């Protein structure tokens, strides 16, 4: 176990806390029944990052973390500071202030080390028309210093993972947009990085290509335990692949955390600290009659009906919701669905951001 650092007198851990390599973890009071859960170190940590262009604060005191196996959506409108932040993480720009760390290595003080453990896929990347797929990957493997069997193994690994093996001899300027994006991802993976930064990887792809690329990114996190930071304007796509997100606007992080945490904050912002929720109720028939009945019930507001489906706000908790459903059934309404509406990532984005541009 790591040696505990000295702490100030006014900043002591309580008796039921210990310090792991990353965070404080509370343990059971009974020493005979201690279950210690070690918290993973962040593989990507952004600390108070700033990038100014004259008076424009493109990145303004940005901080967030990401861990192994996470796919983090980096979300914001055009001009919010996403690409500038990503370029700093990729060591392509220096910050005005602050720092970021990839697997503990500073992008400011140790950029060479960072480049060896980070893969960056920009929104557009160069392709050389006189190369085929395998020659293109070979070029980047050599650029990372791979030689002999190590280089051949790296190329084969990428061809198999991206399912480009059958296109290995195909000229890259004849590839479809979807296959070109797979090649770009393969180039990013050639040195087997721990952290991946993907800037709009699904831009311009047809629906099938987007789904296939999404599946590949999911495999990187779930099976290979990579950390993935991904930006996109297609929020429905991010909502299906990401388990965490950081929302940025006008250079500032508005909220970051797991998707569930962000949805909870969105609900809190929209409704304060009440127990209200949006309910969805579907009946087999009698939808118009059900609508009139629901409007007469306590805690109900904002009722909307689409054929046999009702959506309405309910200003009370779980027990009154259960009672409402019970009374619906007692009234012989043929209810086949009754649930809280799940807010999408797009709902959260619209609720949290204010449409500010720089």
Language model region names:
Residues 196-199:
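Catalytic Walker B motif of ABC-type/P-loop ATPase nucleotide-binding domains
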Residues 214-315:
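ABC transporter nucleotide-binding domain
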Residues 1-50, 355-358:
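ABC-family P-loop ATPase nucleotide-binding domain
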Residues 138, 142, 149-167:
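Conserved ABC ATPase "signature" region
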């Amino acid at each position: 176990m790591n040696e505990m650092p000295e702490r100030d007198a006014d900043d002591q851990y309580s008796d039921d806390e210990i310090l792991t390599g990353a965070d404080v973890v509370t343990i059971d009071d009974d020493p005979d029944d201690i279950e210690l859960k070690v918290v993973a170190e962040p593989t990507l940590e952004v600390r108070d990052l700033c990038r100014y262009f004259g008076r424009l604060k493109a990145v303004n005191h940005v901080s967030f973390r990401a861990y192994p196996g996470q796919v983090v959506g980096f979300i914001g409108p055009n001009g919010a500071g996403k690409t500038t932040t990503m370029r700093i993480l990729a060591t392509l720009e220096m910050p005005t202030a602050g720092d970021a760390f990839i697997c503990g290595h500073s992008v400011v003080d140790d950029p060479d080390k960072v480049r060896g453990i980070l893969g960056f896929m920009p929104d557009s990347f160069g392709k050389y028309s006189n190369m085929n797929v395998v020659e293109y990957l070979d070029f980047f493997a050599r650029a990372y210093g791979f030689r002999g069997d190590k280089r051949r193994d790296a190329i084969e690994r990428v061809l198999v993972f991206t399912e480009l093996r059958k296109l290995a001899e195909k000229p890259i300027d004849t590839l479809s947009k979807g296959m070109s994006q797979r090649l770009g991802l393969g180039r990013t993976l050639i040195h087997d990085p721990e952290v991946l930064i993907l800037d709009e990887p699904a831009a311009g792809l047809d629906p099938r290509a987007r789904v296939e690329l999404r599946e590949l990114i999911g495999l990187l996190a779930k099976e290979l335990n990579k950390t993935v930071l991904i930006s996109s304007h297609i929020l429905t796509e991010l909502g299906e692949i990401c388990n965490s997100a950081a929302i940025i606007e006008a250079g500032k992080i508005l909220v970051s955390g797991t998707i569930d945490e962000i949805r909870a904050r969105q609900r809190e912002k929209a409704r304060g600290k009440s127990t209200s929720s949006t309910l969805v109720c579907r009946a087999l028939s009698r939808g118009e009659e059900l609508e009139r009945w629901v409007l007469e019930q306590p805690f109900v507001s904002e009722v909307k009906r689409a054929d046999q489906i009702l959506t309405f706000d309910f200003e009370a908790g779980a027990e009154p919701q259960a009672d409402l459903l019970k009374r619906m059934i007692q009234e012989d309404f043929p209810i086949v669905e009754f649930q809280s509406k799940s807010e999408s990532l797009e709902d959260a984005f619209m609720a949290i951001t204010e449409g500010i541009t720089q």
